[in-house]
């Protein structure tokens, strides 16, 4: 008879090969199952899932499929014509006091709630997810450093914490810190003349995870310290993962030697979620917050609230709270009324400078590159997008817009606007549609923070 290990491998192999199971579904959900041979019988297969969320999700979505696979394929001791499947949450393993202390000592600001299991994967973030999982699972860095970048609220911090949590499960030493906290800690140790302690804390870890790396810019002493921290970690094959709101070359004021090191390994962009992924996120947030919404309300949130995941979750909670306060039934009309203020387009009234900055960041260009006519495709597209958003959101006349982009022929403005509109409305280019949402998100952020372009130069 097969060993228990072989039985588990055989079952998972059959699941992975099944045409009804995508690779993403297998990696995200079904690969997490552990076969329980002690409870299993000839007509019942018992499995453990690592947490309640996965247990519920796999049972609901894949329970029938697992039953079908095991009934059709005689695996191990399952010989009945019809095999039932039971999935339970795995019992927690007890560790001795000393190992528990060491485990906690390695945990620096890693949020337990952010895991790979509850990260919603779609076409917008699949590459980032696969890279992050490979990094977390590897004993030696497969890429070093790793830098993920993209707009606010797209899941970058979630994926960073997921890496940290997975590493902690393997009893690795993990340091997760924002660049602002790194600065605060640096200044405190510097003031106390205790830099040896600072270096020991940040240079003697297996995983160094830095959030908001763009805030290192313009702080020479901090950049110097981070430069040496980076070098020592890299030289000792310790994994470095960085999160930023823009690509390294677009972090203005960051030393060139740091930009160069940020690009040593692999850089990946987190794109705004498509509608299908947004709907999956809304459903997951409802489940996590134990809020029940009608399908049409969840679809409405996915369609009309921005791509920012935190705003989507806020919309869900706002609907629930208002329904409870008014003792009302949650329906589409209630959702529209409650969420009216969240749907206001903050991009209205944008300055030309903010539009230029948002487009530049989204296409990894410098603002100065866009203001000059060029035959390079990405620059030409950027100039068209500036015109498109300027026509939508600013009262600037064609003449001032032409001057802003150094266009001699004012009629070019209409042609550039029509070109983008055609790509969006007729061709429905997925890339341009996604890019439009990203630029709008960046404009919303710039306008909400009242960030002036001139003050950022």
Swiss-Prot record:
Q: Which residue intervals make up region (Domain I, interacts with DnaA modulators)?
A: 1-77
Q: Segment Domain III, AAA+ region: which positions? A: 109-323
Q: Which CDD domains match?
A: AAA (cd00009), Bac_DnaA_C (cd06571)
Keywords attached to this entry: ATP-binding, Cytoplasm, DNA replication, DNA-binding, Lipid-binding, Nucleotide-binding
The Gene Ontology CC terms held by the record are: cytoplasm; plasma membrane
Q: Which GO terms describe its biological process?
A: DNA replication initiation; regulation of DNA replication
Gene name, per UniProt, is dnaA
GO terms, molecular function: ATP binding; ATP hydrolysis activity; DNA replication origin binding; lipid binding
* Domain remark text: Domain I is involved in oligomerization and binding regulators, domain II is flexibile and of varying length in different bacteria, domain III forms the AAA+ region, while domain IV binds dsDNA.
Q: Where in the cell is it found?
A: Cytoplasm
Name-wise, this protein is Chromosomal replication initiator protein DnaA
Species assigned in the record: Helicobacter pylori (strain J99 / ATCC 700824)
Domain of life, per lineage: Bacteria
The residues the record assigns to binding ATP are 153, 155-157
Where do the segments described as Domain IV, binds dsDNA lie?
324-457
Which Pfam families does this UniProt record tie to the protein? Bac_DnaA (PF00308), Bac_DnaA_C (PF08299)
Q: Which family does it belong to?
A: Belongs to the DnaA family.
Which residue intervals make up region (Domain II)? 77-108
Assembly and partners are described as: Oligomerizes as a right-handed, spiral filament on DNA at oriC.
């Amino acid at each position: 008879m097969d060993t228990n290990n072989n039985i588990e491998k055989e079952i998972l192999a059959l699941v992975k090969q099944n045409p009804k199971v995508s690779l993403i579904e297998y990696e995200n959900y079904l690969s997490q199952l552990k076969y329980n041979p002690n409870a299993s019988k000839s007509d019942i297969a018992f499995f453990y899932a690592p947490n309640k969320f996965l247990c519920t999700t796999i049972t609901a979505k894949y329970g029938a499929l697992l039953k079908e696979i095991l009934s059709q394929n005689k695996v191990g001791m399952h010989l009945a014509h019809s095999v039932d499947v039971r999935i339970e949450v795995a019992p927690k393993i007890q560790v001795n006091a000393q190992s528990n202390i060491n485990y906690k000592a390695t945990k620096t600001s890693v949020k337990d709630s952010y895991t790979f299991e509850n990260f919603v994967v779609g076409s917008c973030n699949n590459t980032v997810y696969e890279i992050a999982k490979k990094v977390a699972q590897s004993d030696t860095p497969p890429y070093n450093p790793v830098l993920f970048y993209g707009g606010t609220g797209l899941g970058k911090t979630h994926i960073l914490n997921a890496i940290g949590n997975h590493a902690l499960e393997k009893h690795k030493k993990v340091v997760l810190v924002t660049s602002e906290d790194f600065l605060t800690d640096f200044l405190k140790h510097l003031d106390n003349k205790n830099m040896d302690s600072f270096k020991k804390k940040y240079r003697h870890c297996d995983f160094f995870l830095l959030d908001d790396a763009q805030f290192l810019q313009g702080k020479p002493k901090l950049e110097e310290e981070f430069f040496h921290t980076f070098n020592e970690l890299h030289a000792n094959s310790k994994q470095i993962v960085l999160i930023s709101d823009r690509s390294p070359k677009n972090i203005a004021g960051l030393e060139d030697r740091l930009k160069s090191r940020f690009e040593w390994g692999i850089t990946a962009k987190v794109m705004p979620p498509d509608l299908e992924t947004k709907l999956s996120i809304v459903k997951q947030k409802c489940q996590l917050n134990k809020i029940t919404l009608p399908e049409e309300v969840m679809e409405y949130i996915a369609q009309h609230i921005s791509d920012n995941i935190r705003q989507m979750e806020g919309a869900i909670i706002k609907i629930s709270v208002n329904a409870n306060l008014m003792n009302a039934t949650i329906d589409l009309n209630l959702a529209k009324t409650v969420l009216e203020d969240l749907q206001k387009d903050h991009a209205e009234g944008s300055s030309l400078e903010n539009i230029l900055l948002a487009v530049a960041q989204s296409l990894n260009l410098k603002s100065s590159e866009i203001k000059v006519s060029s035959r390079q495709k990405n620059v030409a597209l950027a100039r068209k997008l500036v015109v498109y958003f300027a026509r939508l959101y600013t009262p600037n006349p064609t003449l001032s817009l032409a001057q802003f982009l150094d266009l001699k022929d004012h009629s070019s403005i209409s042609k550039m606007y029509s070109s983008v509109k055609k790509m969006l409305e007729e061709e429905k280019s997925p890339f341009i549609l996604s890019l439009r949402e990203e630029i709008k998100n960046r404009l919303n952020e710039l306008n909400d923070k009242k960030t002036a372009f001139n003050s950022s130069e």
